């Protein structure tokens, strides 16, 4: 987001925080003198604050020693957390957690191999049941601040790899019973949004949900296909694809410290020290996720060779 900002930002006053009026005037001045209508629109998009979201930018060192930047956004009103980063190979990963519906969406935008006949990129989405204890709440996330934003972070705990075998496609135009965020986030993955039967059954236990409405939003994979894409020679044959991604750093829990508070007895003649617990930090984790799912052509899974 910030890469387009400098040309607009140079027209802002160098000292102090500009008001919304000053921001509008600065962008208008830029538009008037450069006749750059697109830049005028971009200025407004970049400089209009969103008071409902809180964002952290985290520098994370991956296992290969490379540093990537994660963007973690918390929306308390929607009870959402969105984590996004770009891998060194250009793959863009977006993780959205919908706490209200206990849904986690992982979206992967993978750059295509044009020399092998692929389009510029392809998008896949995986919707799974989210366990609330796996990530701190949106409210707690919104309260986090960095003392040293340029520090390179490494997680305290490696949670290893979790494997998911997907069983159905999601029909995005019917996906509201799962979460309303699927259709917007995964709009480019119309034929490549996946879910598991076991998660449908778990969501059906939530208040206001039903297995019939959830199943109506999905289409099962063809039966009796067990051939992995790395075992198939034809680029046009169906197969089971595997995609793995790792979240290198995320807040997976809160830390509590013990303190002492002074309290009185009922008579008020004695005071005693009592142990109390208070929040004093976060626990950070790393986790990899491997998805196995059906593709209609091996051409859609060239990385799994």
UniProtKB/Swiss-Prot annotation:
InterPro entries registered for this protein in UniProt: Oaf, Oaf_C, OAF_N
Annotated keywords: Developmental protein
Pfam families in UniProt: OAF_C, OAF_N
Similarity annotation: Belongs to the OAF family.
Function: Vital for proper neuronal development and hatching.
Protein's UniProt name: Out at first protein
Protein source organism: Drosophila virilis (Fruit fly)
Origin organism lineage: Eukaryota, Metazoa, Ecdysozoa, Arthropoda, Hexapoda
